[in-house]
Amino acid sequence: SEYYTTENQIKAAVDGTYDGLDDLLSSDLEIATVHLFNLEYLVGTSYRPRAAGNEQNQFLLLSGLEESNGIIRNFWKATFFPLENCNSVIQNVSATDIISESQKAKYLGEAYFLRAYYYFQGVQLFGDIPLKTEPTVDLNTVKIPRSPKEDIYNQIVEDLKKAEQSGLDWSDKTGHVSMLSLIHI
């Protein structure tokens, strides 16, 4: 990649892997992943978590949701756009010699953790989802079939182990991934 040619570009790319957390934590996606709410939808005892808004952002029974629902489409994008960023960082930072080995390990640890986290959110919401661990280089390869949940969970565990072995700091005051993050997932 032409982008990963300076330390600042590499840091910016790593910071970009956190972009998906904004969608995950400041939108309806957090409601869908909170067991208190989503279990009510699964058993059909609740129609929506809020009293106002249009029909798309007032969750209907899960059995009545359609893929054209904008909220569902946003959930899907909030899973796969950040995964693409993580895959790009993992591939390009692994190949660079611009930064120190310790900094490279830290950045890779962050990207592996976040990829695991995004996959965890995705599999909780959708079940079987596409498993993609390399960045897109050819738009003809974008549409890939869903993989079994078991494969996704195996990838999550593998990524978390790599994050654990990366030498992340115990805690991080900047809000970046740390060893403490691994404990809490």
Describe the residue ranges of each PLM region.
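Short acidic-aromatic linear motifs embedded in glycine-rich loops, typified by GG[WY][YF]DAGD(H)
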Residues: 1-110, 114-154, 169-175
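Aromatic- and glycine-enriched pocket-lining scaffold segments that form the walls
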Residues: 180
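Amphipathic alpha-helical segments of tetratricopeptide repeats
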Residues: 164-165
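Conserved small/polar residues in nucleotide/adenosyl-binding loops
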Residues: 183-185
